[in-house]
Protein backbone atom coordinates (compact mmCIF):
# COMPACT_ATOMS: atom_id res chain seq x y z
CA UNK A 1 0.00 0.00 0.00
CA UNK A 2 1.22 3.50 -0.82
CA UNK A 3 0.47 6.54 1.34
CA UNK A 4 0.62 10.28 0.72
CA UNK A 5 1.72 12.92 3.21
CA UNK A 6 1.92 16.61 2.35
CA UNK A 7 3.57 19.49 4.13
CA UNK A 8 5.48 22.67 3.39
CA UNK A 9 8.41 21.26 5.37
CA UNK A 10 9.84 24.72 6.12
CA UNK A 11 11.95 23.08 7.51
CA UNK A 12 11.37 19.33 7.76
CA UNK A 13 11.35 18.85 11.56
CA UNK A 14 11.06 16.13 14.20
CA UNK A 15 7.25 16.35 14.19
CA UNK A 16 7.22 15.51 10.47
CA UNK A 17 9.83 12.82 11.12
CA UNK A 18 7.70 11.20 13.83
CA UNK A 19 4.71 11.26 11.49
CA UNK A 20 6.72 9.56 8.72
CA UNK A 21 7.89 6.94 11.22
CA UNK A 22 4.26 6.27 12.21
CA UNK A 23 3.11 6.13 8.59
CA UNK A 24 5.96 3.71 7.76
CA UNK A 25 4.30 1.17 10.06
CA UNK A 26 1.15 1.23 7.91
CA UNK A 27 2.36 1.50 4.30
CA UNK A 28 5.00 -0.05 2.03
CA UNK A 29 5.71 3.16 0.12
CA UNK A 30 5.20 6.85 0.84
CA UNK A 31 4.78 9.86 -1.40
CA UNK A 32 5.90 13.02 0.39
CA UNK A 33 4.35 16.06 -1.27
CA UNK A 34 6.23 19.32 -0.82
CA UNK A 35 3.51 21.94 -0.72
CA UNK A 36 4.11 25.53 -1.82
CA UNK A 37 7.04 24.25 -3.88
CA UNK A 38 7.04 27.46 -5.89
CA UNK A 39 7.68 29.63 -2.81
CA UNK A 40 11.09 30.37 -1.30
CA UNK A 41 13.29 33.13 0.08
CA UNK A 42 10.64 34.56 2.43
CA UNK A 43 10.27 34.37 6.19
CA UNK A 44 7.25 32.06 5.76
CA UNK A 45 8.90 29.88 3.10
CA UNK A 46 12.68 30.34 3.26
CA UNK A 47 13.81 27.12 1.60
CA UNK A 48 13.52 26.13 -2.06
CA UNK A 49 11.78 22.95 -3.18
CA UNK A 50 15.18 21.45 -4.03
CA UNK A 51 16.53 22.22 -0.57
CA UNK A 52 13.48 20.65 1.03
CA UNK A 53 13.90 17.58 -1.19
CA UNK A 54 17.46 17.26 0.17
CA UNK A 55 16.27 17.63 3.78
CA UNK A 56 13.54 15.03 3.42
CA UNK A 57 15.49 12.52 1.32
CA UNK A 58 18.41 12.50 3.76
CA UNK A 59 16.18 12.35 6.85
CA UNK A 60 13.91 9.50 5.72
CA UNK A 61 16.82 7.38 4.50
CA UNK A 62 16.94 5.84 8.00
CA UNK A 63 13.52 4.23 7.50
CA UNK A 64 13.01 1.00 5.60
CA UNK A 65 10.48 2.70 3.37
CA UNK A 66 10.44 3.47 -0.33
CA UNK A 67 9.75 7.19 -0.61
CA UNK A 68 8.99 9.53 -3.48
CA UNK A 69 9.45 13.24 -2.80
CA UNK A 70 7.31 15.33 -5.15
CA UNK A 71 7.28 19.14 -5.30
CA UNK A 72 3.74 20.54 -5.61
CA UNK A 73 3.18 24.14 -6.62
CA UNK A 74 0.26 26.06 -5.16
CA UNK A 75 -2.65 26.36 -7.56
CA UNK A 76 -5.02 28.34 -5.29
CA UNK A 77 -8.09 26.47 -6.57
CA UNK A 78 -9.30 24.14 -3.86
CA UNK A 79 -11.97 22.51 -6.04
CA UNK A 80 -9.31 20.98 -8.33
CA UNK A 81 -6.43 20.69 -5.85
CA UNK A 82 -6.73 16.91 -5.34
CA UNK A 83 -6.73 16.37 -9.11
CA UNK A 84 -3.57 18.48 -9.30
CA UNK A 85 -1.92 16.38 -6.57
CA UNK A 86 -2.95 13.14 -8.29
CA UNK A 87 -1.59 14.35 -11.63
CA UNK A 88 1.81 15.15 -10.09
CA UNK A 89 2.28 12.10 -7.85
CA UNK A 90 2.47 8.33 -8.11
CA UNK A 91 -0.89 6.72 -7.32
CA UNK A 92 -1.58 6.38 -3.60
CA UNK A 93 -4.17 4.53 -1.54
CA UNK A 94 -4.43 6.68 1.58
CA UNK A 95 -3.63 10.28 2.49
CA UNK A 96 -2.31 11.43 5.86
CA UNK A 97 -3.12 14.90 7.12
CA UNK A 98 -4.35 16.80 10.14
CA UNK A 99 -5.16 19.92 8.14
CA UNK A 100 -8.98 20.27 8.11
CA UNK A 101 -9.11 21.66 4.56
CA UNK A 102 -6.80 18.96 3.17
CA UNK A 103 -8.82 16.26 4.95
CA UNK A 104 -12.07 17.62 3.51
CA UNK A 105 -10.71 17.92 -0.05
CA UNK A 106 -9.39 14.35 -0.06
CA UNK A 107 -12.59 12.98 1.49
CA UNK A 108 -14.72 14.80 -1.09
CA UNK A 109 -12.57 13.16 -3.78
CA UNK A 110 -13.27 9.74 -2.26
CA UNK A 111 -9.76 9.19 -0.89
CA UNK A 112 -9.30 7.63 2.54
CA UNK A 113 -7.67 10.04 5.00
CA UNK A 114 -5.95 9.04 8.21
CA UNK A 115 -5.17 11.52 10.94
CA UNK A 116 -2.78 11.23 13.85
CA UNK A 117 -2.01 13.21 16.95
CA UNK A 118 0.45 16.05 16.50
CA UNK A 119 3.89 15.38 17.92
CA UNK A 120 5.00 17.96 20.53
CA UNK A 121 3.23 20.68 18.53
CA UNK A 122 4.26 23.55 20.81
CA UNK A 123 7.94 22.88 20.15
CA UNK A 124 7.72 21.32 16.72
CA UNK A 125 6.02 23.93 14.61
CA UNK A 126 7.75 25.34 11.55
CA UNK A 127 7.02 28.96 12.40
CA UNK A 128 8.50 28.52 15.90
CA UNK A 129 11.63 26.85 14.50
CA UNK A 130 12.07 29.58 11.86
CA UNK A 131 11.68 32.29 14.51
CA UNK A 132 14.33 30.59 16.62
CA UNK A 133 16.65 30.59 13.61
CA UNK A 134 16.00 34.31 13.03
CA UNK A 135 16.58 35.10 16.72
CA UNK A 136 19.73 32.94 16.84
CA UNK A 137 18.16 30.70 19.49
CA UNK A 138 18.39 26.93 19.90
CA UNK A 139 16.65 25.06 17.05
CA UNK A 140 18.92 22.16 16.08
CA UNK A 141 17.32 19.77 18.59
CA UNK A 142 13.99 20.18 16.80
CA UNK A 143 15.06 18.80 13.41
CA UNK A 144 16.85 15.60 12.34
CA UNK A 145 20.66 15.88 12.27
CA UNK A 146 20.67 15.48 8.48
CA UNK A 147 18.39 18.53 8.18
CA UNK A 148 20.79 20.58 10.32
CA UNK A 149 23.55 19.59 7.88
CA UNK A 150 21.51 20.69 4.85
CA UNK A 151 20.54 24.01 6.44
CA UNK A 152 24.18 24.70 7.33
CA UNK A 153 25.36 23.66 3.84
CA UNK A 154 22.99 26.12 2.14
CA UNK A 155 23.62 28.89 4.70
CA UNK A 156 19.93 28.75 5.51
CA UNK A 157 20.13 30.68 8.79
CA UNK A 158 21.87 33.61 7.15
CA UNK A 159 19.27 33.62 4.36
CA UNK A 160 16.36 33.44 6.79
CA UNK A 161 17.75 36.27 8.89
CA UNK A 162 18.31 38.35 5.75
CA UNK A 163 14.82 37.79 4.33
CA UNK A 164 13.37 38.46 7.76
CA UNK A 165 15.05 41.88 7.70
CA UNK A 166 13.69 42.44 4.16
CA UNK A 167 10.19 41.40 5.22
CA UNK A 168 10.37 43.89 8.10
CA UNK A 169 11.36 46.67 5.70
CA UNK A 170 8.48 45.77 3.38
CA UNK A 171 6.02 45.89 6.31
CA UNK A 172 7.21 49.38 7.25
CA UNK A 173 6.87 50.50 3.63
CA UNK A 174 3.39 48.98 3.26
CA UNK A 175 2.07 50.68 6.40
CA UNK A 176 3.69 54.02 5.66
CA UNK A 177 5.49 53.99 9.00
CA UNK A 178 8.97 55.40 9.17
CA UNK A 179 11.82 53.17 10.22
CA UNK A 180 13.27 53.72 13.67
CA UNK A 181 16.43 55.79 13.71
CA UNK A 182 18.16 53.21 15.90
CA UNK A 183 17.48 49.85 17.46
CA UNK A 184 16.86 51.64 20.76
CA UNK A 185 13.71 53.15 19.21
CA UNK A 186 12.10 49.74 18.65
CA UNK A 187 9.40 48.66 21.09
CA UNK A 188 10.09 45.45 23.02
Curated annotation (Swiss-Prot):
Q: State the UniProt keywords alphabetically.
A: ATP-binding, Cytoplasm, NAD, Nucleotide-binding, Nucleotidyltransferase, Pyridine nucleotide biosynthesis, Transferase
Q: Which GO terms describe its cellular component?
A: cytoplasm
Claim: Transport is one of the keywords in the record: no
Q: Indicate what this protein is called per its UniProt record.
A: Nicotinamide-nucleotide adenylyltransferase
- GO biological process assignments: NAD biosynthetic process
Supply the source organism's classification. Archaea, Methanobacteriati, Methanobacteriota, Stenosarchaea group, Halobacteria
EC number of the protein: 2.7.7.1
Q: Give TM regions.
A: none
Alphabetized CDD domains for the sequence: NMNAT_Archaea (cd02166)
Superkingdom, according to UniProt? Archaea
Which chemical reaction does it catalyze? beta-nicotinamide D-ribonucleotide + ATP + H(+) = diphosphate + NAD(+)
Q: Which SUPFAM superfamilies match?
A: Nucleotidylyl transferase
Which portions of the sequence form the region Disordered?
Answer: 166-188
What is the similarity comment for this entry?
Belongs to the archaeal NMN adenylyltransferase family.
Enumerate the GO terms in the molecular function aspect. ATP binding; nicotinamide-nucleotide adenylyltransferase activity
Pathway assigned in UniProt: Cofactor biosynthesis; NAD(+) biosynthesis; NAD(+) from nicotinamide D-ribonucleotide: step 1/1
Amino acid sequence: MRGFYIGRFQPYHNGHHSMVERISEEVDELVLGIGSADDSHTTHDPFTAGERIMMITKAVAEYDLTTYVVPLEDINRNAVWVSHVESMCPDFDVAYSNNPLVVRLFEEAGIEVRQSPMFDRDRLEGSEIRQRMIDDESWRDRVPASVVEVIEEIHGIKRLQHVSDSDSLERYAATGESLPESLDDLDD
